[in-house]
Each structure stands twice: as C-alpha cells, then as structure tokens.
C-alpha cells in the first residue's frame, strides 16, 4: 500500500519497538466498554494487556503474511492498519486510531486507499 495517502497521513511498517504504542491504540478502543465494568484500574490494565496479547497472537496465526503498519499524521503515530493480501483478495484485518484522531475522515482515507489498491490489481476487499 502507498506510504503516503493524503496530506499529512502516511504509513510505515510496525516494528517491535512500536508494541507499547500499539497497545495504547488497542486499549483506547476498549475504553467505552471497560467504563461499564466495576473493576479497579489494575484489573482493567491486566485485562487489556491479556486481550492485546491474545489479539496479537491470534492475528499472527490467522494472518501470517499480513502487513501491520503504523498510521502517521504529520510524522506522529496515531493508529494501526493491518492488511492481509492473498492471491485472490485483500483482507482489511484491522484499523484503529487514537480517540483524538477518530471521526475526522482519516479512517475513510485509509479504507479508500485499500479499496483503490485492490482495484488496481483486480482483487476484492473483504
């Protein structure tokens, strides 16, 4: 996928040292549901780390060829995009943004980029 999607938005391959950031993105996607449970912060943190680890291992097993990319805005990491290409299709595995970057069109730009790339090689996106 193109590493430059729109002004100020870019992608780069995720590295091992991105794990703390990727955890923060993941945890931010679970905050609303965790606000509903009667757990203290330590319990929530334990749960989030366990779930992040399970998701990471599950994605690695199910999609070993997937590209995990860090979404950048003005050079700063703001989210994660994971896409798995196969010979006959492209699977949009996951897209997640930090809360302050949601609902401003960034996700739309990213999904459109995935769709455009798939169309350019004649593959459907699922």
Listing of model-derived features with the role each one plays in the protein:
Residues 18, 75, 105:
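Conserved G/P- and acidic residue-centered "switch" motifs that form tight phosphate/ATP-binding loops
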Residues 30-58:
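Conserved GNAT-fold acetyl-CoA-binding loop/helix
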Residues 95-103:
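A short, internal acetyl-CoA/4′-phosphopantetheine-binding micro-motif in the GNAT/acyltransferase core
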Residues 103-116:
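Conserved acetyl-CoA-binding loop-helix of GNAT-fold acetyltransferases
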């Amino acid at each position: 996928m193109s590493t430059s999607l729109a002004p100020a938005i870019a992608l780069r391959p995720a590295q091992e040292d991105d794990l703390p950031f990727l955890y923060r993105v993941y945890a931010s996607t679970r905050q609303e549901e965790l606000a509903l449970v009667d757990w203290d912060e330590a319990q929530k943190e334990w749960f989030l780390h366990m779930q992040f680890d399970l998701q990471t291992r599950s994605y690695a097993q199910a999609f070993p060829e997937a590209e995990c990319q860090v979404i950048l805005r003005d050079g700063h990491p703001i989210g994660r995009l994971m896409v798995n290409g196969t010979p006959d299709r492209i699977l949009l595995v996951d897209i997640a943004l930090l809360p302050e970057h949601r609902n401003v069109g960034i996700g739309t730009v990213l999904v459109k980029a995935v769709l455009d790339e798939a169309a350019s090689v004649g593959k459907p996106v699922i």
